[in-house]
UniProtKB/Swiss-Prot annotation:
SUPFAM superfamilies: Translational machinery components. The keyword Mitochondrion does not apply. This is Large ribosomal subunit protein uL18. The gene is rplR. GO terms for cellular component: cytosolic large ribosomal subunit. It comes from Clostridium acetobutylicum (strain ATCC 824 / DSM 792 / JCM 1419 / IAM 19013 / LMG 5710 / NBRC 13948 / NRRL B-527 / VKM B-1787 / 2291 / W). Pfam families: Ribosomal_L18p. HAMAP family: Ribosomal_uL18_B.
Amino acid sequence: MLNKVQSRKRRHLRVRNKISGTPERPRLAVYRSEKNIYAQVIDDVNGTTLVSASTLDKDFSAKAGSNKEAAKLVGGIVAKKALDKGIKQVVFDRGGYIYHGRIKELAEAAREAGLEF
């Protein structure tokens, strides 16, 4: 029987077989830990990370009171960095997580900041 983490990893592998980031439309990958949330814009063809943001960054303000607020700030930061590099369209990779809570807040903040997906 699979536990929660193994099920998430299995879902993520299943999704990763279907989507990949290109230089024109890179992949916005999200990882969530107990305390922090991370977002990267990845070009899978070249195997490079173009932009990244997380709650551990120096430019991240520790003013976020809750995890959802922190995810919203990270989504805005990663979108702003991507737009500064000329990236407007991405493919959203939720990393096998359910589209709810912190993942949803990050995605909606990135959309509000101007990223298209």
